[in-house]
Amino acid sequence: MTNMDKLYEAVEARGPVCVGLDTDFSYLPADFVESTLTKGENIVRFNKKLIDATKAVAGCYKVQIAYYESLGMEGMKAYADTLKAVREAGVPVIADIKRGDIAKTAEMYAMGHFTGDFESDFVTLAPYMGLDSISPYLPYAEKQGKGMFVLCRTSNGGAKDFEYEKLADGRHVYDLVGDKLNALGKDYMGEHGYSSIGLVIGGTHIEEATEIRAKYQDSFFLIPGYGAQGGKAEDIAQYLTKGNGGVVNSSRGILLAYKKQPGVAFDEAAYNECVNMKEAIAHACSLL
């Protein structure tokens, strides 16, 4: 069984909410911070409480490495400890690293994020340099069932600068990327009909949602853009297949939910936000 199979089963069991642990120190409630601890140690305490509170309603977690790299060595220890906490909770974890290099460098990235202190179940990758920026990760998919989510059509406003440019044959650049990755993924199929090579498909540009889902039925989607970035449940639902086939990420909306729920502890508020998000997406899927 591949990690993508396990993610599919996690979504079946708990829903498609992906909790983004893009944890900035400034997000921590002031009365939670222990002055005798480092920023990294406080972030780990915060993350662990969030994981404990939300693991029953989270399909997976996504840990954005930049928030930890910015704190230097203590931040990287916090990153490793956070990945470990998610894995110990028995929930799939995505390392949001967006690597895009080739050859030996990419081999080292793959080793660094699929084994050892920073081991994760999935990584995010950037395909701009070509398929040889993806291939060094594939032995881990083949031998260990590891997975990856490759940037295809993203949720940021600047996506239109490159991804939406049209080719001579009428396709967009994101179509070319998706087509090549979908074809490559045919050799890495899991038991539930999804490849170990997933796609990052932003939930804020919905014009082609139905077409994209129908076109890449073998590809599991990582769908950013929900909540703070403007993505709505009724839009997100169009990228899912009977409520599965993708995970929907929310970071600030969950991490900072306590600011919209006065008097509620941050971990309880995060749980409430996950439940609300899960129910909203399920309702939207039921209307399709």
Predicted features along the sequence, with ranges:
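Glycine-enriched alpha-helix->loop->beta-strand junction motifs that scaffold or abut catalytic
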Residues: A13, A58, T115-D121, E142-M148, ...
